[in-house]
């Protein structure tokens, strides 16, 4: 039950930032996947986020976004660009992803 509450709270925080993320970082869509979605996270787990961009950011802007989300949520965030998904693992991730 606590896992579901944590996931819901994370989703609410992220959803509340979508306009800012779109404006400042050109984020088109954001979704969660991985251990948090499967309710298998531990205290050392990071939060896996799948991101698609309207305009591809440079490396520094990408890292800035990852750090911003980590600070916002208080959880280490691992950003994965949807555009860079490998076919085999990409299918699994896309089946699991929970849109924000």
Please report, for each region that a protein language model flagged, where it lies by residue:
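Metal-dependent nucleotidyltransferase catalytic core
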Residues: 4-5, 11, 53-83
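Short hydrophobic/aromatic patches at helix-to-coil boundaries
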Residues: 94-100
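Conserved beta-strand core positions
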Residues: 30, 47-49, 77
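Helical scaffold of the NTase/Pol beta-like nucleotidyltransferase catalytic core
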Residues: 1-30
């Amino acid at each position: 039950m606590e896992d579901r509450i944590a996931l819901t709270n994370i989703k609410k925080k992220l959803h509340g930032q979508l306009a800012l993320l779109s404006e400042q970082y050109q984020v088109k869509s954001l979704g969660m996947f991985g251990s948090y979605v499967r309710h298998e996270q531990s205290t050392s787990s990071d939060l896996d986020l799948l991101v698609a961009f309207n305009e591809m950011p440079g490396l520094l802007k990408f890292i800035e976004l990852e750090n911003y989300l980590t600070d916002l949520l208080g959880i280490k965030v691992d950003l994965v660009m949807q555009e860079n998904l490998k076919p085999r693992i990409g299918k699994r991730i896309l089946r699991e992803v929970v849109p924000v």
